[in-house]
């Protein structure tokens, strides 16, 4: 990357939350607690699934990968955000900026596909129960998870590669708390039409495709549940889907808010707030959502609690 006078860009200055700098101590403690809770919760989910034989099913296979992805993408942005509360100048080397976005974009995209797969799993279980073991075999599920990581890697690599080819002549101050593509494009003096097009195409296609998979899966699930004659069967099916549906609603609701904002100064600040929720709060909520509404998880946690205390 070069500036307009051919001076090489070696670092970026992350503006973060300059307007709230007087509350840095409170914000630091709050987001540190959220981050620690997120890491412990998701690590606990992974550990529980891999050590308890009751969780050796395909549903939990997807869940442990979702927990892993949540750990990775929140760890890509939260530590640097915490640093912005304690340092007056939050500088980041160009190489670090590239790595940060590459990791974040890879796992954030993978998260979308994993949530979509976790909608397909109950669809097959409820709508096609006799064919579940054939359609959702372990080999198929491994390929689906691998595909989610591949899609994440492709999206991140393309976005990063085209962003690295830009020249900068305006400033090296990024109006964000981490290195995201839109605020970086705003600093470029190169033609960014291709970059914007790629951003819209990749982000749009990933969100639309995974969103449609989730929507149609739940349309068929709800239609099948409503046809059930047994009220107990309907209640059990609704309970099976409730946790995932809650997580999906929060996830896509936040993304919709982020990308439907107008490009004003106020919307940039609102975008930061939305990104905080998306990048730090949602990874913390997912373990709570899936454990609090899951009897097997709650029973396993009670057993562990009795052993420890």
UniProtKB/Swiss-Prot annotation:
Disulfide bond positions: 97-189
InterPro entries for the chain: GPCR_Rhodpsn (IPR000276), GPCR_Rhodpsn_7TM (IPR017452), Olfact_rcpt (IPR000725)
A Pfam family reported for this protein in Swiss-Prot or TrEMBL: 7tm_4
Single GO MF annotation: odorant binding
SUPFAM superfamilies given in the database record: Family A G protein-coupled receptor-like (SSF81321)
Cytoplasmic domain ranges by topology: 47-54, 121-133, 218-237, 293-309
Localization per Swiss-Prot or TrEMBL: Cell membrane
Glycosylation sites: 5, 155, 265
Family: Belongs to the G-protein coupled receptor 1 family.
UniProt xrefs under PANTHER family: OLFACTORY RECEPTOR
Protein name per Swiss-Prot or TrEMBL: Olfactory receptor 5AK2
Lineage: Eukaryota, Metazoa, Chordata, Craniata, Vertebrata
